Amino acid sequence: MGPRAKTYGDKIVNHANIGKLWSAYLDKEITAHDAAVMMALLKVARTKFGQPTEDTYVDAAAYMAIAGECKDY
């Protein structure tokens, strides 16, 4: 368990919870996989404006890695 997990909890559980909240808001099922991909897309969108930091790219890659881990949830 990494330092972020101590603060935010398990990444798969966290993205499943994000998916549940987005599902309720959108009235459409959003899976943990969907949530992780959409978080990566948010980071991609940020690269279009201003001067994105290296962290933006690292975060986008990390969200896609999480999406890979969540694909069966």
What are these regions (language model features)?
Residues M1-Y73:
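Intrinsically disordered, low-complexity regulatory regions
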